[in-house]
Swiss-Prot record:
Pfam family, one: tRNA-synt_1g
GO molecular-function terms, A-Z: ATP binding; metal ion binding; methionine-tRNA ligase activity; tRNA binding
The protein, known as: Methionine--tRNA ligase
Matches recorded under PROSITE patterns: AA_TRNA_LIGASE_I, TRBD
Cofactor annotation comment: Binds 1 zinc ion per subunit.
Organism this protein belongs to: Francisella tularensis subsp. novicida (strain U112)
Record keywords: Aminoacyl-tRNA synthetase, ATP-binding, Cytoplasm, Ligase, Metal-binding, Nucleotide-binding, Protein biosynthesis, RNA-binding, tRNA-binding, Zinc
Catalytic activity from the UniProt record: tRNA(Met) + L-methionine + ATP = L-methionyl-tRNA(Met) + AMP + diphosphate
Oligomeric and partner information: Homodimer.
Length: 673
């Protein structure tokens, strides 16, 4: 028995899953189900990727906390996975104390090995949003291949990685403004120091996809760079120890560690030895299933980090391609940017699972969901070929032969052919050549249907003395159906579950898949799958378009704000007003006054007393030491509380009062011009 741990890329918890996501999860789920049927101990873990600026900003725009946002989408993701029959053994999250503990432990180990350094770097800063911009919040032209509209950390066209500062014509995704450069101290992981570790891992990895190996060779040729593992506040994530929550771990540092946290959580709840699977000396197998867009993180950084912190490195990393629909990139306007839930609201998951399996290979090829072919293949293969075998034979067995299969095999040669294909189908599943496995299974289905067409049990049943042959022919038909459905169990588990009920058997061992049933009692046959009507697919497209229309529906038009600007003054009139920086040295309540605070202001050696109507907005003790702006040459005004020798500048909208504060560096007495 092999011990296997499988992880799938963690979905980002700031939006709903679409069919492009489901391609990778269905691929890994099929492989895991196959391994479990083989009798291997195969544990399948995943979880939500929950940190980063996109989540923080989306939560802010919705008026909720980041925690509320990730909980909402984590729950929705898990429901989508469950309904698509993705059977994780554990589904966790990166935002919890266990993952925080793991992240900090790995960081400390790297730091103790002098693999972490600090240096000041020029960062993209959005002056309008007043925040540093993460890589993915800067877009521009790729400095390598010149592709437009690429992210600040990597190009989706050529796969190159770079710093946001290298982008051509960069712009802020938040405000659309050109970011400025601003220095900030960041933490770096010394990836070049571990180049040998990575190359040793690659050389020992016999299962690495050729496309991945070629890409790694290209990156080595370009030269590895130290990896920036920090981000500036504000940021939703784990603070780097010792930074007073001003620096946070980059999401791509703590996200892969979510694999470890999810598996460790599973181990804690099931009394499994974590080190037996992920310890440095473990002989178990570890596989990461990912999309091709995140190879860089999983095949460079991840093995480097694991190899230097006492963890087992992956046995291999398996990447899948992207999904296109009708030969084109998924599009909201065409209705082909289909969410998982939209599909599930209209069709059963088995059809899409089967279609994806019929197209998936071990290569990193993009898969096209041709909707016309999807309908044809589902109806032809699942309904017309496989299920049809049982529907053509079951009635005779149930009604005429006490629902019991024959004790003899009518065509041993054909039975042998079904059995001989077992090894080839097994190898195809093992190597993730699902399309080849499906072709082999459907070739057998064709032979089964040809057998039934040739012997025509519906005609034999009308002939006197042919009862035994009818029994044997239909029993062989049911047995061939049984073999086919057993082979398809990793792909269409819910249909197979219904078939198991009909056959009065549960397929728990892959080795038993080709075995025929002798003198075995079956149940009454009920339809296992229905044909897909084109209208169902059309409705999926219509629902997707409606969703887009709702997203783009104009918000209720707000009345444009009107500024009640006073009459113009000349420049000379304005220059008569002497505005000065003032430091508030004292602040106190004014007895008998509901709105006033008494302020003593230092103008750089000159002291002035001012009564300001800001009591509703500020506590006196909070103002002491602050700098503000005052009108220094306003004629003194005698009030019943004392003499007011100027005016402090403040803004207000009737709902709040906000005194003006100059930027750091302004000194008392400086004139404001």
């Amino acid at each position: 028995m092999r011990k296997i741990l499988v992880t799938n890329a963690l979905p980002y918890a700031n939006g709903d899953l679409h069919l492009g996501h489901m391609l990778g999860y269905i691929q890994s789920d099929i492989w895991v189900r196959f391994q479990k049927l083989q009798g291997n101990q195969c544990i399948f873990v995943c979880g939500s990727d929950t940190h980063g600026t996109p989540i923080m900003l989306k939560a802010k725009s919705l008026g909720i906390t980041p925690e509320e946002l990730v909980t909402k989408y984590s729950n929705r993701h898990l429901q989508d996975f469950t309904d698509f029959e993705i059977n994780f053994d554990n589904y966790h999250s990166t935002h919890n104390s266990l993952n925080k503990e793991i992240v900090e432990d790995i960081y400390n180990k790297l730091n103790n090995k002098n693999l972490i350094s600090k240096k000041a770097i020029a960062q993209a800063y959005d002056p309008e949003a007043k925040m540093f911009l993460p890589d993915r919040f800067v877009k521009g032209t790729c400095p390598k291949c010149k592709a437009e509209d690429q992210y600040g950390d990597s190009c989706e066209v050529c796969g190159a990685t770079y710093d946001p500062t290298e982008l051509i014509n960069p712009r802020s995704v938040i405000s659309g403004q050109s970011p400025i450069q601003k220095n900030s101290e960041h933490f770096f992981f010394d990836l070049p120091a571990l180049e040998k570790n990575i190359k040793d891992w690659i050389e020992s990895n016999t299962l690495l996809q050729p496309e991945v190996a070629n890409k790694l060779a290209e990156w080595f040729e370009q030269g590895l760079q130290s990896w920036d593992i920090s981000r500036d506040a504000p940021y939703f994530g784990f603070a780097i120890p010792g930074t007073n929550e001003q620096k946070f771990f980059y999401v791509w540092l703590d996200a892969p560690m979510g694999y470890i946290a999810s598996f460790k959580d599973y181990c804690n709840r099931n009394e499994i030895d974590f080190d037996d699977f992920w310890g440095d000396n473990s002989e178990s197998e570890l596989y990461h299933f990912i999309g091709k867009d995140i190879i860089y993180f999983h095949a460079l950084f991840w093995p480097a980090i694991l190899s230097s912190t006492g963890y087992k490195t992956p046995t291999s990393v398996f990447a899948n391609g992207f999904l296109t629909v009708n030969g084109k990139k998924m599009s909201k306007s065409r209705g082909t940017f289909i969410q998982a839930r939209t599909y599930l609201d209209n069709l059963e998951p088995s059809y899409l699972r089967y279609y994806f399996a019929s197209r998936l290979t071990s290569r990193i090829d993009d898969i096209d969901l041709n909707l016309e072919e999807f309908v044809t293949k589902s109806n032809s293969d699942i309904v017309g070929k496989v299920v049809n075998i049982a529907s053509r034979c079951a009635g005779f067995i149930y009604k005429k032969f006490d629902a019991t299969l024959s004790g003899e095999i009518f065509d041993p040669e054909l039975e042998s052919e079904f059995s001989k294909n077992h090894d080839a189908i097994t190898q195809a599943f093992e190597k993730r050549e699902f399309a080849h496995a499906v072709r082999l299974i459907m070739a057998l289905a064709d032979k089964a249907n040809q057998f039934i067409d040739y012997h025509k049990p519906w005609q034999l049943a009308k002939e006197e003395g042919q009862e035994q042959k009818v029994h044997q022919v239909c029993s062989q038909g049911i047995n061939m159906f049984k073999v086919l459905i057993a082979y398809l169990k990793p792909i269409i588990p819910s249909i197979v579950a219904e078939a198991e009920r009909f056959l009065n058997i549960q397929f728990i061992s892959w080795a038993d898949a080709p075995k025929f049933l002798i003198n075995h009692k079956i149940d009454k046959f009920k339809p296992l799958a229905t044909r897909i009507e084109k209208e169902k697919v059309d409705k999926i497209l219509e629902d997707t378009k409606k969703m887009l229309e709702n997203e783009q529906a104009p918000q209720s038009k707000k009345e444009e704000p009107k500024l009640d600007i006073t009459a113009e003054c000349t420049f000379d009139d304005f220059m008569k007003v002497d505005l000065r920086i003032a430091k508030i040295t004292e602040a106190s309540h004014v007895e008998g006054a509901d709105k006033l605070l008494k302020l003593i202001l230092d103008l750089g050696g000159v002291t002035k007393q001012v009564f300001a109507g800001i009591k509703s907005a500020y506590k006196p003790e909070d103002l002491i030491g602050k700098h503000t702006v005052m009108v220094a040459n306003l004629a003194p005004r005698k009030m019943k509380f004392g003499m007011s020798e100027g005016m402090v500048l403040a803004a207000g909208d009737g709902k709040g009062i906000y005194i003006l504060e100059p930027h750091e560096g302004a000194q008392p007495g400086m004139r404001v011009k």
